[in-house]
Amino acid sequence: MACSSSLSSKWASWGASSRPHPSVQPFVTRKNVVRYHKPTSELSYSPLTTTLSSNLDSQFMQVYETLKSELIHDPSFEFDDDSRQWVERMIDYNVPGGKMVRGYSVVDSYQLLKGEELTEDEAFLACALGWCTEWLQAFILVLDDIMDGSHTRRGQPCWFRLPEVGVVAINDGVLLRNHVHRILKKYFQGKPYYVHLLDLFNETEFQTISGQMIDTICRLAGQKDLSKYTMTLNRRIVQYKGSYYSCYLPIACALLMFGENLEDHVQVKDILVELGMYYQIQNDYLDTFGDPDVFGKTGTDIEECKCSWLIAKALELANEEQKKILSENYGINDPSKVAKVKELYHALDLKGAYEDYETNLYETSMTSIKAHPNIAVQAVLKSCLEKMYKGHK
């Protein structure tokens, strides 16, 4: 994947290989993205326009189609029709979708930092970097679903649950992770911040996988011990498992692209890590109290004996009798026992406890953000906070 000297022509020259085939019918439609049910090996595309649209969604998805096309036609590997179709379908199934908060945050943040309209090259690079965060997210989720034995993700069966996929999903997840560095090498290798980007993605991946390990080993089969499920342990899990890649990574990408040294932005990192933990705690809350039809997945934290914010808070608030009920029912895949746990959550008013946490988090974060000396950085942090705040409403 050799790098071209100019990106401006890419919007036209890559159009012939970057748009979905007309026979590929959308099967999930969202406000921000159309996903495709099956790939095709027959190429018959219309060219992309050379003028950047004012619609971020459209621009972002155009870049996605370009990146995907280049990956499945990568000359470093001799794809045949079967392997190309498999990879295309796998990418379409797992990468776009969800809220795409991470990807959009890279572009939004870079725009706010620059303070003026982006050039075509800048817009393309920002979108490409945004998609790198989404590709990393896909890698993490594919493997996370396998480890958790999950059934649905974003309103459809988890990738590994498809009969023709199964354990091949493990290899697919690793492939998605490698795609990130293929994209970075192609478009950023000549940039002065390229090494810092590589280090950022590698460090973020290490932190996330380490957090996943903590989350997994604390609930090994036959070793349930709710006395260990403290708010301290939950904070450690959410910090490493999700905070860095969900919140810090996208903004750090934008800062690097803008020419900033991340070592000069320790305060920004601290704020973003705290917001990232809030994002993960919000996910814990929605796992039990969210509507599966709205959020696209069926919560299983109780059955899986996860050290979620809810169970840690419940154990903090519960009396001895209530702790006994939790011990007897938590972590068991039985609807009646799950119902008892949820009933106790309501009795302890965990909804109210979460709302108190959320309100305090917002106020504290906003105070820290307003204290930052750089107005542009303030705007980036405020944008990040507003995107997350009350995301369950």
Swiss-Prot record:
GO-annotated biological processes: farnesyl diphosphate biosynthetic process; isoprenoid biosynthetic process
Range of the transit peptide: 1-53
Coarse class of the protein's main subcellular location: plastid
Keyword terms: Chloroplast, Hydrolase, Isoprene biosynthesis, Magnesium, Metal-binding, Plastid, Transferase, Transit peptide
Pathway: Isoprenoid biosynthesis
Cellular-component GO terms for this entry: chloroplast
Annotated Mg(2+) 2 binding sites: 144, 148
Descriptive protein name: Bifunctional chrysanthemol synthase, chloroplastic
Native source organism of the sequence: Tanacetum cinerariifolium (Dalmatian daisy)
